[in-house]
Design a protein with these regions (language model features):
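Accessory RNA-recognition modules of RNA-modification enzymes
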Residues: 1-263
Length: 263
């Protein structure tokens, strides 16, 4: 994958990018084989490879810059790095990021400044359903001071962006590296984003955990379903279940199974 920001030394989030992906997989397979060597009965299946770019269906963007010139991406030290064109994201994310920047300008949302402890908008969290192509957008704010402005201008954003299905505000008042706070305010009539893997519907709420690589997640869930198919299991507990991907796949098998999800 060719990444301008990585080559320029501005973003090192994909720290192994200089190593060819096939070589990365081979190294991981070798490490796994060494770890599993004491267990002679273990069968190691081939690794499931991911697409190298355009696969990440969730973006966590630090908002920096100013309300007139917002930057979505990361901070390299104290230097804002715009990752709106990051090749990890599907093609539909770039125009979405452009609309979000325009909305920040229109609503006058001041990015939070870490050193000064000033400003309101900390993060943008954007997710897309690969089943429908629809989006969920979350604004992570320091307080509710900008809530009225977001509500006022939301209709404009929805008009410009018909694929925006769910929009919410998360309040995170603490000055530390915490992604989100406990309070979530849903601003749209729709409060879930529907995804579908292997013909099984999954419903994402703003604060629920969900896999970011849709193709690999679908293969992972299908593998668990296949392995459990022959087991004489009548009850399934899905621990740290998130939206229930594993549990729902196991419960939807040909056997009658009672499912309990625990998050």
């Amino acid at each position: 994958m060719n990444c301008v920001e990585f080559l320029a030394g501005r973003c090192n989030s994909c720290s192994q990018l200089a190593v060819p992906y096939a070589e990365q997989l081979a190294q991981k397979q070798q490490q796994l084989a060494l770890l599993m060597a004491p267990f002679a009965e273990a069968e190691l299946l081939p690794a499931v490879a991911s697409e190298e770019q355009g696969f990440r269906t969730k973006a966590k963007m630090v908002v920096s810059g100013t309300k007139d010139q917002p930057v979505l991406g990361i901070l390299n030290g104290q230097t804002p790095v715009d990752l709106s064109a990051c090749p990890l994201y599907p093609a539909a994310f770039a125009p979405a990021f452009a609309l979000i920047k325009s909305f920040i300008q229109r609503a006058g949302l001041t990015p939070y400044q870490l050193e000064q402890k000033q400003g309101e908008l900390k993060l943008i969290l954007l997710s897309q359903s690969q089943h429908s192509g629809r989006f969920m957008l979350r604004f992570v704010l320091r307080s509710k001071n900008c809530l009225a402005s977001i509500q006022k201008h939301l209709a404009w954003l929805q008009q410009q962006w018909p694929e925006l299905e769910l929009c919410s505000v998360n309040v995170q008042p603490v000055h530390m590296a915490v992604l989100e706070g406990p309070e979530e305010i849903v601003l749209t009539s729709q409060d879930v984003l529907r995804e579908e893997f292997n013909a099984i519907p999954l419903y994402l709420t703003p604060q629920s955990f969900f896999q970011t690589n849709a193709a690999v997640a679908a293969a992972l869930y299908a593998t668990a379903q296949h392995w459990a198919e022959a087991l004489p299991v009548k009850k399934v507990w899905d621990l740290f279940c998130g939206v229930g991907g594993f549990g729902l796949h196991l419960a939807s098998s040909s056997q009658q199974r009672a499912l309990t999800g625990i998050e």
